[in-house]
Amino acid sequence: RHRQRGARMKFASTRGRTPPTPIDAALVAGLAPDGGLYVPERIPVVDVVPGDTLAQTAHDVLTPYFAESSLRDALPSICAHAYSFDAPLRPMTGDGDHLLELFHGPTAAFKDYAARFLAEALSRLRPRNAGPTTIVVATSGDTGAAVASAFHRRDGFNVVILYPEGRVSPRQAHGLECWGDNVRTFRVQGTFDDCQRLAKQALSDEALRHEIPLSSANSISLGRLLPQVAYYAHAALHFRRERGQ
């Protein structure tokens, strides 16, 4: 269903001051030590046959990135969990436009897919008998709820959510504050940028990370960015199969 060309897959920091990193380490770190985002050193060539399910397409598209990962054999199971709800492509009235529905997850946000993928991946990468990892999330609404849902009551993880007080809707505030257990939510007197700055400061603090294992579930995390490719690929493949274009 796919073929891969080229050298071994590594991930580089956008700031260029971190050595190329294997995907497992990039997923666990969330943010590169130099404060940059991890991105693939190259984009592999992938030939994909349209799968019957979104989970199958996700597996086929993501496999080259996980070829040398300890998660390789678990990838079908991870995808089955993360993409267990569909992302249907609906035709709209007019000139052939279509709408990709990404609101069928537990928190009605497109971020549910990647948050669930990341939670499954980090759970499997977590060393046995290790202390809990704290997931730090800055949010303006949707991200925090999706991450909270994905990690809620998941062994070995705590979640800290930061959101700007008075700058989310009442429904979003409820979605951020309703969890309890291993999820703690804090209102920040400031903007989303202030929340993001606090999260990045924590993730870049080596002394703090030595004391408390930290990771990110914001879109700065490779584990959030990469899984989002799947539903676009799935929609494009099926559109081409059905419409021939």
Residue ranges and their predicted role:
Residues R1-R8:
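Short, Lys/Arg-enriched N-terminal segments with co-localized hydrophobic residues
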Residues R8-Q245:
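PLP-dependent amino-acid enzyme catalytic core
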